[in-house]
Amino acid sequence: MLPDFIIIGSMKSGTTTLYRNLSAHPDVDMSREKETDFFVAEKNWRLGLDWYSGQFLPQGTRKRGEASPNYTKSRDFPGVPERIAQHCPDARLIYIVRDPVVRAESQFRHSFLLGALDDLDMATFEGSHGYHHIVDASRYAHQIDAYLEHFSKEALLILDFDRLVQSPQMVMDQVTAHIGIAPHPIDGLGLHNDSAQLSRVPAPILRFAHSSTGRALADLVSRETRDKIRGFLAKGKARKTPPFSDGLRASIRRDLSADTDRFRKITGQDFAHWQV
């Protein structure tokens, strides 16, 4: 059993909210793990199709879906669109985006809290691998280029995070129409802020949880149990992240300007509220 639709990103743009709202739909079977990362060669591709199929219920008529923001991080994880097209050629794709600068800043905070920026020096951050890793995920036009080589524009639904916040039911109705199921009322928005919770979990525990051993142990318990454990652990004092300077924001706007203009042309959406 392979997915009928895939939320391909972008990171820190509401993919968890989409995943949870779709999980509550009676005609949808979302993957056991929200982020299967199956089509990422550097992550779970080696586990094979049997493992991936096991993320979904073995039978039934419900639409199957998953949500892996790493599917739109081509700088670090190339080849994802080709693998999806090979095994799920008829999949409906969903790509939710937000202000590219705000998204990059949110990913920066998230990465810092996970310990991915332990050697961070803000004086030399611009131009570093960490900088390009974060900015690349906001190059929305570049990220969908390879997808549009294998899928039609009609197969790709582009959503705006701010519209999801302002009109959640309308956006979810767009999603259900795109994947071919009846609309379903949502119970509020339920925006999920990982970083706010992560900031209160002790750093050593976070590092273990995101290690291969930690992920393997997490597979042994239900999603509801994992949420309860994380909520229990998130009782400490919130850790602070380094300030994001106006100069750094200006550099990101400069570096993303051309790509963002091209994204507007591809999608036909103006995204007038964005900083770039």
Predicted stretch roles:
Residues 1-72, 83, 87-91, 100-106, ...:
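PAPS-dependent sulfotransferase catalytic core
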Residues 1-19, 23-30, 84, 92-96, ...:
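A generic "structured core" feature
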Residues 16, 72-75, 101-106, 165-170, ...:
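Short catalytic/ligand-binding loop motif for oxyanion handling, primarily in non-cytosolic enzymes
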Residues 34, 145-250, 254, 268-276:
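The conserved 3'-phosphoadenosine-5'-phosphosulfate
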Residues 39-47, 71-77, 134-135, 163-167:
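Acidic-and-aromatic substrate-binding clefts and catalytic sites of carbohydrate-active enzymes
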Residues 49-53, 81, 144-145, 260:
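Generic structural signal for well-ordered alpha-helices
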Residues 67-72, 124-135, 243-248:
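Surface-exposed cleft-lining segments at the edges of enzyme active sites
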Residues 82, 90-95, 102-163, 170, ...:
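PAPS-dependent sulfotransferase catalytic domain
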